[in-house]
């Protein structure tokens, strides 16, 4: 199985290069998001709002059929769905009411994605939202699994919590979270309708895959991708950071923190001291 997968990997990697170089891809509209759009954090969104990360996602299909239906959620290359949003999500001009949760770090529309080669949002076979499209494998005893939380109206949260990588490795575990909001959600200033949140991200690829990819794709080559996707070192770029995107898939700048009253008092005291010192220096000497 490993030898076959290695062969498939080589073929898929070659195809990925062809996709990048093909005229079709050249005609597609691809927007690159700079790493500076990410904000240091180190927390999940659910750490901030409380309530946990939700229930384990049980796979309903995917490449490794032996893991389909396992109540533990442990699997390799599986997906679950379709799952209803409970609202309408407009994505690349199309309205969606349901999605597929894919073990390999993304959600998709219309069909599940079991591909383990992260061709990125530009090469995905279906419309995709990808906080970390990579070769996730949660079969290792030390690995966490994919969770879904949908108890908040107009909000869907998926968490790949401390997940391992192929082939059932659990010596390094990535932790990342996706937040999707419907039109009925009152979005606070400084937040958006889609959020990517990352904790520790110590692994980025496997022996039979390539570095992960981050962003959005419409399944036809048009995409919004984070700079460095499919390039070694991307895991360090996203680790312990987060980013919100608005309805146009543009990054939302974070709101600058408002100084606390005590901070204001210290600032005013400092300004008063500087003003007094300035007046003292400008005061003419009476001894002359």
Question: What is each residue range found by the language model?
Answer:
Residues 8, 13, 22-30, 249-268:
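Short, threonine-centered small-residue motifs that mark membrane-proximal processing/anchoring sites
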Residues 29-256:
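Extracytoplasmic Ser/Thr/Pro-rich, glycosylation-prone low-complexity segments
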């Amino acid at each position: 199985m490993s030898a076959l997968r290695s062969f498939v990997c080589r073929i898929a990697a070659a195809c990925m290069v062809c996709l990048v170089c093909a005229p079709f891809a050249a005609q597609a509209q691809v927007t690159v998001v700079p790493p500076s759009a990410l904000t240091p954090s180190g927390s999940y969104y659910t750490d901030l709002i409380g309530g946990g990360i939700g229930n384990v996602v049980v796979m309903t299909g995917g490449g490794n059929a032996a893991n389909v239906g396992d109540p533990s959620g442990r699997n390799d290359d599986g997906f679950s769905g379709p799952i209803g949003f409970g609202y309408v999500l407009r994505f690349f001009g199309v309205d969606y009411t349901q999605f597929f949760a894919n073990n390999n770090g993304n959600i998709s529309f219309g069909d599940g994605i079991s591909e383990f080669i992260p061709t990125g949002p530009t090469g995905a076979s279906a419309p995709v939202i990808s906080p970390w499209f990579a070769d996730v494998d949660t079969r290792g005893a030390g690995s966490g699994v994919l969770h879904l939380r949908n108890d908040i109206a107009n909000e869907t949260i998926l968490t790949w919590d401390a997940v391992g990588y192929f082939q059932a490795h659990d010596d390094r575990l990535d932790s990342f979270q996706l937040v999707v909001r419907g039109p009925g959600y009152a979005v606070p200033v400084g937040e958006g309708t889609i959020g990517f949140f990352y904790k520790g991200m110590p692994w980025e690829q496997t022996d039979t895959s390539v570095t992960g990819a981050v962003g959005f794709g419409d399944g036809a080559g048009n995409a919004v991708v984070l700079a460095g996707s499919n390039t070694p070192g991307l895991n360090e770029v996203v680790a312990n950071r987060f980013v919100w995107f608005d309805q146009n898939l543009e990054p939302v700048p974070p709101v600058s923190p408002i100084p606390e009253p005590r901070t204001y008092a210290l600032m005013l005291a400092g300004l008063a001291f500087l003003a007094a010192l300035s007046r003292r220096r400008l005061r003419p000497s009476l001894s002359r």
